[in-house]
Amino acid sequence: SDVYKRQVRDPFLIRSPEGDKFYMIATDLKIYGNNDWGAAQRAGSQSLMVWESNDLVNWSDMRMVEVSASIDAGCTWAPEATYDPITGEYIVYWASKTSADNYGKQIVYYAKTRDFYSFTEPKKFIEKNESSIDTTVIYNDKEDMYYRYTKNEGGNTNELGAKTKSIFIEKSRTLLGEWTPVGSESLNANQWVEGPTIFKFNADDSENDQWCLLVDNFGGIGYYPLLTNDLASGEFTRPDDSTHLMPSRARHGTPIRITREEYDAVMAKWGDVAPENAEEEQLK
C-alpha cells in the first residue's frame, strides 16, 4: 500500500450477487516496525481499503474509503461484507474503538453500501461486555439462517460464556435482526485464535454437508481447520494434521468458491509466484 498507513491487513473477498464482479476490502494498518497496538487502536485509520475486479486477475487501483469518522473511531479493523437480499445492499462490518468510552472497548459496527464508494452512517452490530473483533458471517440456506463467528478479544470471559481469545457464535434469520447465542464447548476449548472464516465444502468433497471454520492461531502456526456437519449444534472437531495440508503460516483471509475457468485464469496470471521477502512479509 502507498496510501495512508502504507500497509494493509485482513483481506476479505466477496463476489457480487450477479456473479460478475469481485470486491476486496482490507484493514488500513501498519504494525510492522513499531508493534504499538495501543496507538493502532486509538489513533489508527478511519477508512477501509477497497479494490474491484471482474475476473480476479485484473484489479482496480486501491481506494481509501472513510467509514468510521462520524463515530470518532481509533481504528477500523478486519472489515467483511455480506450481501443482504432483503435490501439489495452489502452489510459491511468491522471493529472499532471510539472516543465515546475513551477507546476502552472494541465494538463491531456496520454500514450499508451498494457500490463500496458511498456508505451509510455506522451503527453498532455487536457489543458485549468484553471487546469483540474479527466477525465473519455465513448463510445456511437449508435452515434459512445466518451464523456469525466473532473473537472475544477481551481479557475475560464475556457474557455469552466465551473465554478470552476464543470464538463465539450467534445466529439470526436476518442480517440486521435479533441475534441469539449458540453455545460451543469446542470453540471455547480453542483459545488464542482470531480471524475466523468459514466455508462449506463442495458436494463432491464431502459425503454430507460439511463446513470448515478456519481459525488463526496468531501466536503460532496460523490457520488451522475445525469441521462440523451441523452449524446449529455449534460444535466443531479438529481433524488430525495428517488429513490436510495448510500453506505455511496462512493468516487472516478469505476462501471463496470460484469456477474452473476463474481458477485457470488466476493460475495463469500468478501461478505459484510469491512476493520478494515473502517470509518477512508474512511477519508483518
Indicate where each model-derived feature is located:
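Short, small-residue-biased leader/transition segments that mark boundaries at the very start
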Residues: 3-4
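Hydrophobic core segments of beta-strands in well-ordered, beta-rich domains
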Residues: 11-40, 61-67, 76-111, 122-128, ...
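Repetitive beta-architecture junctions, highlighting loop-to-beta-strand starts
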Residues: 46-48, 105-108, 164-167, 209, ...
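Beta-propeller blade signature
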Residues: 47-55, 107-114, 168-172, 225-230
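Trp- and S/T/G-rich repeat-edge/linker motifs of beta-rich repeat architectures
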Residues: 58-64, 118-125, 180-182, 235-245
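Conserved blade-ending motifs and adjacent loop-strand segments that build the rim/top face
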Residues: 187-197, 234-252
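C-terminal closing repeat unit and adjoining cap/tail of repeat-based domains
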Residues: 212-216, 221-240
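Blade-level signature of beta-propeller repeat domains, shared across WD40, Kelch, NHL, RCC1
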Residues: 239-278
